[in-house]
Each structure stands twice: as structure tokens, then as C-alpha cells.
Amino acid sequence: MAKPDNQNQMVMEKTESYHNGNKALIELRKVVKVYKSAAGDYKALKDIDIEVGAGEFVAVIGKSGSGKSTLINMITGIDRPTSGEVLVGDTAVHKLSEDGMAKWRGRNLGIVFQFFQLLPTLSVAENIMLPMDFCNLYSLKEREERAINLLKIVELDDQAHKLPAALSGGQQQRVAIARALANDPPVVIADEPTGNLDSKMADAVFSLFENLVSKGKTVVMVTHDSSLAKRASRTILLADGEVVNEYVAKALPALTPQQMIKVSHSLELITYPPGSSILQEGSTSDKFYIISQGRVEVALQRTGASDIVVAHFSPGQYFGEIELMRGGKTRATIKATPEMPVEVLALERERFLELLSESEETKNTIDQIVKARLQENATGRRVD
């Protein structure tokens, strides 16, 4: 029997682009999915651009009908995009034939569904051996050994020879995760894997995913549980078939997903070289800035003394709000730090003020930030 072919599996560490030009392990480029029916066309995904790097743990969140499962189906090849590209490692998934898709998926993806889908007439160990059989990997003895070792990982090796019906729901889901790992895939995709479990079992299953990531696996998981999603290294928020900008979501969490999408459509991406000024103290400013890459430093002028740096801001933080809410000239100089360029998402004054009128909670939160920053500035200008 064949052993896993490292030439056919995706490389976990990549310093250069993959064969199709993607630098991330998983990339969706301008993906559109339209479902046709007698009632008309329904666009489930709208120009989706997503990157997931090797070794990331990404949670996909959003309300029912937002496009989460459709997105997962694009990555796994269970469904095909109407247009756009789906790239996983060196493979253009959207171009694979049905036969090629099945073989590629069996060796490169571990898939876990909300419903366990274990075959009821096979033992727990035999269920785990199925993917190895399908891909013709390992000898029979090696398959049996791998099945037991995988069950040890999920702490169910003592249940190996039982039928699935003898296990609880949480135990069956852990078996499903072990089965997803049967062929040692670099990527694990999970669609609502904790949806039918109580909180204790959901936490145990989530911990398994965290352990897999610590060992180098890449995990993409759809979840409706916001508390679990926060434990992932990154979240992708979907709303009405669109991806909400993650930096907008981090900077303005009180907005609804629909408001975040609306704001994202109004943003201008601006890049500043290392060490360059974005705002100069005493100048005029008519934009609200959210940092998306790099870091900035906040410097204050002081009478009879040198300028002082009082703060540093990172991706997901913002600046420029003081002048838009309080008026007047800029109160500080904002510069890109010397070590790297800075990318910011700029929102025009009119759209920013409109946003505040639409979200009272956001307005109150930013107003508190303004008060705190003005106090910090006053303290920072003092010369002892």
C-alpha cells in the first residue's frame, strides 16, 4: 500500500508563491456564487477575497444565511464558484475534475461536519480507517495502528471496537475529528462542529482543534458560538455574502455587520513609507483612519522641549477622530514607525459623522476614547 506522497501533499512552510501565484496556503479570489431557481438568481457569495496562511486557526462567523457554509463548500470543492478562483496550496480547486477532486480532497483535507456521519454498521476504528482505504494509503496493519493512535489523541481509544451508537454525541464528534485526520492532511475544515453539543463537549472539541494548530495544522472552522470564535487566531465575519473588513470589525465592534459592510465600501486604502508623517500637528484633517498594517507613533510638541512620543497604535486601532468630533487643528503628529510601511483605511468626514448618527453606541465609545486621549495629550505636554 502507498504511503503519503509528500510531493502530492501541500507544503506547510512556504517562502515563495505556490504554483498558481498564491502566497497564502488558502486563497479565494473574487469568488462569486449564484444559485439559480424559478424564483430568480440568489447571490450567496459576492466577490469574496480571503487569505488563510499555513498554521492559522480561522473562525468563520456570521448570521444564518450569511454565506458561511457556502464559503466552506468552495474551499472543500463540495460546490463550485460561479466565477473566481479557489486556490489551496499548489492546487486550483475550482479547475479539478470530479475524480481529481475526490483524490485531492482525500489526501489534503480533513473535513468535519455538524452531523457526525459515522457509518453505523462499522466500528469506531473502522470508521477512521475509511479515508485510508479510499486513498489506498498504508498497509492494513498500519491503518489499524493509525486508527488507534488517532483515537488516543481524542481520548477514545478504549471505544475503538464499539459501534457509533454506543457513544455520546460529543464522543462521536471527536471520532469524526479523528477520521478527518486519518490521512494526515495539512488542512482541517469544520462546518459547525460544535453545533449540536453542550458547552462542555463543545469546549473539549474546540480544544482538540487548538491542539492541532499547535502541531502545525491549518484549521478553518464555521461556528455560531462567538465565545469559541474568540479563541481562534483570527475571525472572518460574513454578512449578506460579503466579508466584513477585519480591521473595521476590530475598530468599530458596536456596528452591525451590515453597517460594517457599508463602511468598508467607503474606505480608501492609503500606504505610507516607513517614518513618514500621516498627520502633522497643527494641520487640518478631514479623515478618520483605521490601521490595517504596520504601526504608527503619536508625537506631541512641547514648549521649550523636544517632541515626545506618547503612544503607538497597531492594526485595528484608529486615529483622527478627535478633530472630526471636536473640530480644530490636529492635536498631535502621527507618523509611520521607522521599521515598516503603514497601511490605513481612510473614511471621509461626512461618512464618519453619518456613521456616528447611525450607531449611538459607537458614538459614545469613540467619545470616551476622545476624552481619554485629550487627557493623555495634556499630561504628555507637561515639561518637568
Identify the role of each PLM range.
Residues 1-34:
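ABC-family P-loop ATPase nucleotide-binding domain
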Residues 24-221, 226-229:
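ABC family nucleotide-binding domain
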Residues 78-80, 236, 289:
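Post-Walker A (P-loop) alpha1-beta2 connector of ABC-family nucleotide-binding domains
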Residues 82-85, 240, 286-287, 293:
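Conserved coupling/switch loops of ABC nucleotide-binding domains, chiefly the family-specific signature
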Residues 231-237:
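Conserved catalytic segment of ABC-fold P-loop ATPases
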Residues 239-276, 314, 356-378, 382-383:
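Cyclic nucleotide-binding regulatory module and flanking cytosolic helices
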Residues 250-309, 315-317:
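Regulatory nucleotide-sensing modules
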Residues 310-368:
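Cyclic-nucleotide recognition modules
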